[in-house]
Amino acid sequence: MLTIARSLYEKIIEHARKDHPDEACGVIVGPIGSDTPTRFIPMQNAERSPTFYRFDSREQLMVWREMDDNDEEPVVIYHSHTATQAYPSRTDISYASEPQAHYVLVSTRDESETEFRSYRIVNGEVTEEPVSISQLSPGGRPPYPRNDPPPIRVPSKA
């Protein structure tokens, strides 16, 4: 199960909507071995495409070095699908290289709502997992004021 702070969940959706009609991509990192996403890092889609994403290699190297320096690892690797459902494509599956990561897909194909789903992808096998939206901040503190968690499908801000 992916447990993610509401603020991080909202940042992923905001990034996906902002980059639409191109696919958005990024990572949320956390302490090694914690399975706790804490730091949101939106990345550039080097392809600038509505049907494909690829991290910019220089930016990715910088981010991965920074993670190493901070004893962090990618906990969530996310991207959006702009015209299809939030399910990994064959290309997404073939590029999944972090077996411990949660692969989040956000579909922005419908302007009225956003589909948000999480998967584990290990050795080409895709397993969907539940998503829990936490009221705690990424640092583990309760937010003030306290709000109810949003549904997994979020209305568009259009």
How would you describe each model-predicted region?
Residues S80:
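Metallo-beta-lactamase
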Residues M1-P74, A83-A158:
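Conserved beta-strand-loop surface patch within small alpha/beta domains used
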